[in-house]
């Protein structure tokens, strides 16, 4: 029956190849008119076929939606995320086509952003894949639009269920049944960027005159296609409706000088600009829905009913009995009940996943109301909506609040409010006209926003050094579109910095011309960044660049940002929020960038906020504290730092050939054997000295582990040896073989050699050990303490991870602490329920690595429920008292995971 219904759709008859050839013609169209003509021809033929297929039938639900969701994939809301990026597709193609990993075509796919010089497709993965696939694929595919959508549905659902093998299987079906041209467009649909050269508004306007407006108030592509299938029939009422996500009204950036004029010389409202997640709430009785500004549904997180979620249970009783239904617009905030303050988004938390965060709670800050009961309020004035909002619910501190507003008349009041927001470390202020009506997806229209970074001179700016780059995509293909920036480790007085810590990635603030000019300036200095052998002068966090540049060849850029926030992606342990390049500091040399000390001082100055100055009326937007003048560049005599000077070996007499032509780099010596003395002795034995290790350096000698030595160790390119080894060589006048006791650090090849010669404690497999050496070996063996099972759990987990046993089914629950619903009364051990399947489940959990507890308290990660689900509500109430929230799952999650040998997606078993 289902297949019969499917065959009665236009999408089941239209080949995917026809859609792709249409998209190809649209993209290649010379002008807008030609592009529109090609799309209209395809749309008209679809509608004609639809009329022929469904003639004389009423209530037909078939529409243009199957094609529209592929043409405008960025507006897709029904399908979940694919979880696929260009790199994954590249690896899949390499595997499917059996391409040599180091071959030309495989490297093209893997390094698609790197310009090749031959073509202008750098950064366009779909085009590069097309040319690789063209000689290897079918001339024409066999899939229909319906089949493509069904396979993409499978990709999305299996990605959500973390079933990677099934994701791969569906992708293979798509790939093996498509031509190279079809795969080019398929890739763009998956990546959600078609590059057609016409906007979604143009597509909508061709489809139907009311399409843009209907999509703004519903964000539902399928509803637009169904309700507006007939271009000759319009909608009489297009307005915000209950449980349909709408695109919210937005604020325009304001010029402080023009505020009074923009408000038409009338009074206006000033509100705090909140730093949370824009969210709309739809309520009908005890049924709730929550939607983000882009129309994504977050009801599962915040709660569909008063019995579930991180918000709904706490606000349901705030609504009066006379309020059956309503639609609210506001900001979802993270509230700290201890300090009674809102958290800023820059701090590490996700408001949409607050159940996992301890010490914080979800708070809905409401600033507008669009419907109460059956009365729609979008066309009412803001003043009227505010009056209605105040009687819609009773605010509950830290759970649901009304954003406070003040009435103002002058520019001075706006300036005072902005300065007050700066003092309170807030994001900024909103200015709203009392007579404005609510216009979905419109920016401005009576709403303005003012943030400190919009006002010249209010922000502290940072002078940072470019140390890495990322190849661009699309219009920026073939050039660096983003840069990795760093600050310097504070050098000793009189020295230049030699080590730089990454701080942020920046990709905005400059025009294409400025980007091109900067690219030309740095082009010849870029080097590929290898994660296994990073440059010792650039220390990265988890964020690594695609290419890097030696600091002395780079330039300083001046960056403006909103604030400094914590981040483990960068070596500094922090990064910049909303960074953008203000200008290139041609007046500064590379070593004059800010240091870690400067960064720390800025971070402590205003809790990380970079807006610390006040604006004053009549100052022409200049702050009281004047801008720093650029530091003028003074001519300095060229000199070499003392510790990098080559030693004076003119008076050295050669006494041995033990180190003939062997290169050493001495970083430091020992008490009684300073660096210069060791260098002289090496020269006497025929060796020669360098001040920076290179590929020909035999080893680095270090008496202490300073910053330079640590950087050399982190690069993993050179062996680092104690000076004691040199002293042994000088004493015996031979090149003494290395032993573990001499080594500070070993590069990979040396480690392999030592692994064949010595055990993990440094005891040789082949050479007899004397008493002193044996004592050293014993000192390196630490006695193991008696540990409880609880203490052993992380040790076992570490061993499993070290030896790659952590993927074994026997350890699948290793990191979980689990409470089972075995007691009629929570935490009353005397109320144990006998003869229940959960007793066996507890044994299965222990056998597969879980820690099973009989007391429900902080630290429990999961609660498992059997067939008797009467206590689920009790567990949810108990959970609200805990800082770290546990998940409540059906027992079948355990049994299914054990049966299938891997953890199953938890969301399918949630109660």
From Swiss-Prot:
Q: BRCT domain: from which residue to which, for each copy?
A: 654-743, 808-911
GO BP annotations of the record are: base-excision repair; cell division; cellular response to ionizing radiation; cellular response to lithium ion; central nervous system development; chromosome organization; DN2 thymocyte differentiation; DNA biosynthetic process
- Gene3D superfamilies xref list: 6.10.250.520, BRCT domain, DNA ligase, ATP-dependent, N-terminal domain, DNA ligase/mRNA capping enzyme, Nucleic acid-binding proteins
Going by the UniProt record, its keywords in alphabetical order are: ATP-binding, Cell cycle, Cell division, DNA damage, DNA recombination, DNA repair, Ligase, Magnesium, Metal-binding, Nucleotide-binding, Nucleus, Repeat
User: PANTHER family, from UniProt?
Assistant: DNA LIGASE 4
User: In which residues is Mg(2+) 1 bound?
Assistant: 331
Protein's recorded name: DNA ligase 4
A single Gene Ontology CC annotation of this entry is: nucleoplasm
Which EC number applies? 6.5.1.1
Q: Where in the cell is it found?
A: Nucleus
The stretch of residues making up the signal peptide is none
Q: Which CDD domains match?
A: Adenylation_DNA_ligase_IV (cd07903), BRCT_DNA_ligase_IV_rpt1 (cd17722), BRCT_DNA_ligase_IV_rpt2 (cd17717), OBF_DNA_ligase_IV (cd07968)
Which reactions does this protein catalyse?
A: ATP + (deoxyribonucleotide)n-3'-hydroxyl + 5'-phospho-(deoxyribonucleotide)m = (deoxyribonucleotide)n+m + AMP + diphosphate
Question: Whose protein is this, by species?
Answer: Mus musculus (Mouse)
Active site annotated at which positions?
Answer: 273 (n6-amp-lysine intermediate)
Subunit and interaction comment: Interacts with XRCC4; the LIG4-XRCC4 subcomplex has a 1:2 stoichiometry and XRCC4 is required for LIG4 stability. Component of the core long-range non-homologous end joining (NHEJ) complex (also named DNA-PK complex) composed of PRKDC, LIG4, XRCC4, XRCC6/Ku70, XRCC5/Ku86 and NHEJ1/XLF. Additional component of the NHEJ complex includes PAXX. Following autophosphorylation, PRKDC dissociates from DNA, leading to formation of the short-range NHEJ complex, composed of LIG4, XRCC4, XRCC6/Ku70, XRCC5/Ku86 and NHEJ1/XLF. Interacts with DCLRE1C; the interaction is direct. Interacts with APLF.
- Annotated region Required for catalytic activity: the residues are 610-620
Phenotype of the disrupted gene, per the record: Embryonic lethality associated with extensive apoptotic cell death in the embryonic central nervous system.
| Residues annotated for Mg(2+) 2 binding in this entry | 427
* Residues noted as binding ATP in the record, renumbered to the chain: 271-274, 278, 331, 345, 367, 427, 432, 449, 451
Family the entry assigns: Belongs to the ATP-dependent DNA ligase family.
Name the domain of life. Answer: Eukaryota
């Amino acid at each position: 029956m289902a297949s019969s219904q499917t065959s009665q759709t236009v999408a089941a008859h239209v080949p995917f190849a026809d859609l792709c050839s249409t998209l190809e013609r649209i993209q290649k169209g010379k002008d807008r008119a030609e592009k529109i003509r090609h799309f209209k021809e395809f749309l008209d033929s679809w509608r004609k076929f639809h009329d022929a297929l469904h003639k004389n039938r009423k209530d037909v639900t078939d529409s243009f939606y199957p094609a529209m969701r592929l043409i405008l994939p960025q507006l897709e809301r029904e399908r979940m995320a694919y979880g696929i990026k260009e790199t994954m597709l590249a690896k899949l193609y390499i595997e499917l086509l059996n391409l040599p990993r180091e071959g030309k075509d495989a490297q093209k796919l893997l390094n698609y952003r790197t310009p090749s010089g031959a073509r202008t497709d750098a950064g366009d993965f779909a085009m590069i894949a097309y040319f690789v696939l063209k000689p290897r694929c079918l001339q024409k595919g066999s899939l229909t639009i319906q089949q493509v959508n069904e396979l993409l549905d499978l990709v999305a659902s299996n990605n959500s269920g973390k079933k990677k093998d099934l994701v791969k299987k569906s992708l293979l079906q798509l790939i093996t049944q498509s031509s190279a041209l079809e795969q080019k467009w398929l890739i763009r649909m998956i990546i959600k960027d078609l590059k057609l050269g016409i906007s979604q508004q143009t597509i909508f306007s061709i489809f139907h005159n009311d399409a843009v407006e209907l999509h703004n108030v519903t964000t539902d592509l399928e509803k637009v296609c169904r309700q507006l299938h007939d271009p000759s029939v319009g909608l009489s009422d297009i307005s915000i409706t209950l449980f349909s996500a709408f695109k919210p009204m937005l604020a325009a950036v304001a010029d402080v000088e023009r505020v009074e004029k923009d408000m038409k010389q009338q009074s206006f409202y000033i509100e705090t600009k909140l730093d949370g997640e824009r969210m709309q709430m739809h309520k009908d009785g005890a049924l709730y829905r929550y939607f983000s500004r882009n129309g994504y549904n977050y009801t599962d997180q915040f709660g569909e009913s008063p019995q579930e979620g991180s918000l709904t249970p706490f606000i349901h009783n705030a609504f009066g009995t006379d309020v059956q239904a309503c639609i609210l617009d506001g900001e979802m905030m993270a509230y700290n009940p201890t300090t009674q303050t809102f958290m800023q988004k820059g701090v590490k938390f996700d408001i949409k996943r607050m159940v996992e965060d301890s010490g914080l709670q979800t708070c809905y800050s409401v600033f507008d109301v669009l419907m109460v009961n059956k009365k729609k309020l979008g066309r009412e004035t803001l003043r009227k909506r505010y009056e209605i909002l105040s009687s819609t619910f009773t605010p509950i501190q830290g759970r649901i609040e009304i954003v406070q507003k003040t009435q103002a008349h002058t520019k001075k009041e706006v300036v005072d409010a902005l300065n007050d927001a700066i003092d309170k470390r807030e994001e900024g202020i909103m200015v709203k006209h009392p007579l404005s009506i609510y216009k979905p997806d419109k920016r401005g229209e009576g709403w303005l926003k003012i943030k400190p970074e919009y006002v010249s001179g209010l922000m502290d700016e940072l002078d940072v050094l470019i140390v890495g780059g990322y190849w661009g995509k699309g219009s920026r293909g073939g050039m660096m579109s983003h840069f990795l920036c760093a600050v310097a480790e504070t050098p000793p007085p009189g020295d230049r910095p030699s080590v730089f810590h990454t701080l942020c990635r920046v990709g905005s603030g400059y025009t294409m011309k400025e980007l091109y000019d900067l690219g030309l300036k740095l082009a010849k200095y870029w080097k590929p960044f290898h994660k296994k052998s990073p440059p010792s002068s650039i220390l990265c966090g988890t964020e690594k660049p695609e290419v890097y540049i030696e600091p002395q060849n780079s330039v300083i850029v001046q960056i403006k940002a909103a604030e400094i926030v914590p981040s483990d992606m960068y070596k500094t342990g922090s990064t910049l929020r909303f960074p953008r390049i203000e200008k290139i500091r041609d007046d500064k040399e590379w070593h004059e960038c800010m240091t870690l000390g400067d960064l720390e001082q800025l971070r402590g100055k205003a809790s990380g906020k970079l807006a610390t100055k006040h604006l004053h009326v009549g100052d022409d937007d200049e702050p009281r504290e004047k801008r720093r003048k650029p530091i003028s560049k003074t001519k300095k005599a060229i000199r070499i730092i003392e510790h990098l000077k080559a030693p004076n070996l003119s008076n050295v007499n050669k006494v041995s050939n033990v180190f003939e032509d062997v290169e050493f780099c001495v970083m430091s010596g020992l008490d009684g054997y300073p660096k210069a003395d060791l260098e002289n002795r090496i020269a006497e034995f025929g060796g020669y000295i360098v001040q920076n290790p290179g590929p020909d350096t035999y080893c680095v000698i270090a008496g202490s582990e300073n910053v330079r030595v640590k950087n050399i160790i982190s690069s993993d390119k050179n062996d680092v040896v104690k000076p004691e080894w040199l002293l042994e060589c000088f004493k015996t006048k031979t090149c003494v073989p290395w032993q573990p006791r001499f080594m500070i650090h070993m590069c990979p090849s040396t480690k392999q050699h030592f692994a064949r010669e010595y055990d993990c404690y440094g005891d040789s497999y082949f050479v007899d050990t004397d008493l002193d050496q044996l004592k050293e070996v014993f000192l390196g063996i630490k006695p193991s303490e008696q540990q409880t099972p609880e203490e052993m759990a992380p040790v076992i987990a570490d061993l499993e991870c070290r030896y790659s046993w952590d993927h074994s089914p026997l350890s699948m629950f290793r990191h979980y602490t689990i409470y089972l619903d075995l007691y009629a009364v929570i935490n009353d051990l005397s109320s144990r329920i006998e003869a229940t399947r959960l007793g066996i489940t507890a044994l299965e959990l222990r056998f597969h690595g879980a820690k099973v507890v009989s007391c429900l308290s902080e630290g429990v990660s999961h609660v498992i429920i059997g067939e008797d689900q009467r206590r689920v509500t009790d567990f949810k109430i108990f959970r609200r008292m805990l800082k770290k929230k546990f998940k409540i799952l059906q027992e079948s999650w355990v049994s299914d995971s054990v049966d299938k040998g891997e953890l199953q997606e938890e969301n399918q078993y949630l109660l």
